[in-house]
């Protein structure tokens, strides 16, 4: 029921955006990835199709309140492997609402032009109804409810950022991602973006992602994994940008690495290089 309401609102926003470019907008980002990385873990080590859609309303015409809207994230597998575990298309569908606000430091003084603080607050529901695994059939595991808070200090030099995700139901956990990125303009339409980030988590989050600690006891909250990525983007037009990237993932916690190494599952990877190609549409 909640998903149907969300998708209906998303479609309505898309139609509005098609007729009135301002203040409504829709961003759609389909991408092909050689693996699926999420919250310090390789969830799938096979090709996946992922699509992120954000439909929103910019309040700038009625007041300086930022942007509000809906978002949707879908995951589909592109191979037959693990077909007994979940269906191919839309085996995961996440959705939620968001509020985004950009504080432009240039308002204070021209010296700060190009600097700003972007804040993104989201309420999410992650659903896994395409799974046939017994753990996913239990009602308490049918979906995950969480909050997200993300901020970045945008500037022409090196942009630091962080993301906090708090799991509420059915499990209580805390995940923190923090890093830096830099966009290098190669030409008017071509850019290169290196990005580095660390992933940290609470004790409960360690157990949810990796399983019980080897030898018993509990994990300590702290660093989980390190990531380095490089993206090359080509802006074809104001409405479309093509991009390709490579992402190196590695678990940084010794006990977690030992636990994953002992896991016989084919997607239990301690380190992995992930390739991505995609397109970003803005309407």
Feature locations, PLM:
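Outer-membrane pore/translocation modules
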Residues: 27, 43, 72-179, 258-270
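Cleavable N-terminal export/targeting peptides
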Residues: 1-25
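Flexible, solvent-exposed coil segments and beta strand-coil junctions
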Residues: 21, 28-35, 72-77, 154-163, ...
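Outer-membrane beta-barrel transmembrane domain signature
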Residues: 52, 57-64, 101-107, 153, ...
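Compositionally biased regions
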Residues: 1, 5, 10, 119, ...
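Acidic/proline-rich low-complexity IDRs
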Residues: 5-11, 107, 157, 189
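Short glycine/proline- and aromatic-enriched beta-strand/turn motifs that initiate or cap beta-hairpins
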Residues: 18-84, 274, 280-282
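Sterically constrained small-residue positions within well-ordered secondary structures
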Residues: 12, 19-21, 44, 61, ...
């Amino acid at each position: 029921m909640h998903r149907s309401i969300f998708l209906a609102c998303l479609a309505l926003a898309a139609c509005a955006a098609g007729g009135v470019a301002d203040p409504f907008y829709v961003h759609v980002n389909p991408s092909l990835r050689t693996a699926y990385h999420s919250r310090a873990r390789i969830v799938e080590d096979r090709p996946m199709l992922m699509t992120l859609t954000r439909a929103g309303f910019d309040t700038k015409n009625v007041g300086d309140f930022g942007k509000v809207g809906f978002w949707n994230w879908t995951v589909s597998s592109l191979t037959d492997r693990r077909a007994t575990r979940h269906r191919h298309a839309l085996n995961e569908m996440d959705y939620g609402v968001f509020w985004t606000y950009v504080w432009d430091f240039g308002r204070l003084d021209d010296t700060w032009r190009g600097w700003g603080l972007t804040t993104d607050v989201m309420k999410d529901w992650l659903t896994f109804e395409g799974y046939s695994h017994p753990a996913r059939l239990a009602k308490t595991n049918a979906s995950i409810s969480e909050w997200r808070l993300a901020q970045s200090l945008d500037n022409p030099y090196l942009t630091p950022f962080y993301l906090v995700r708090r799991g509420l139901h059915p499990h209580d956990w805390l995940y923190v991602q923090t890093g830096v990125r830099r966009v290098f303009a190669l030409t008017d339409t071509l850019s290169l973006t290196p990005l580095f980030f660390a992933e940290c988590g609470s004790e409960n989050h360690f157990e949810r992602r990796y399983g019980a600690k080897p030898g018993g006891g509990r994990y300590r909250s702290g660093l989980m994994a390190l990531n380095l990525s490089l993206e090359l983007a080509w802006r074809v037009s104001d409405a479309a940008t093509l991009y390709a990237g490579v992402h190196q993932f590695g678990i940084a916690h010794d006990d977690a690495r030992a636990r994953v190494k002992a896991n016989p599952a084919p997607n239990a990877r301690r380190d992995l290089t992930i390739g991505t190609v995609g397109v970003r549409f803005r309407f």
